[in-house]
Amino acid sequence: ALPGSSRASWLTEPAVAEALRAQRKELFGVLEAEDAERHTDYARTLTVFLQHGGQLVQTAEALGIHRHTARSRIARIQELCGIDLSDPATFAEAFFAATAEV
């Protein structure tokens, strides 16, 4: 990002933005469906987890839940989505997808 810019300019390129929207729909669609069916809070949990750089304690504090609950939710999110958020590339992909404009 340029000085004074809050976002990397390449993220707004049409092809990149479209790819991120598609990834967001795929990733969060699964979680939103689970949330609707089971009254969970997985989509919000993942968003907060990504916003806090994968830090469970900070995520738990932001959500007002115990860190073990946050850990359990992240484990279930990874299972539902078939992803491993401990992998830096996967984490980055999820992070950028979460920031995509819908």
Residue locations for each model-derived region?
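Cytosolic nucleotide-utilizing catalytic cores of signal-transduction proteins
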Residues: A1-V102
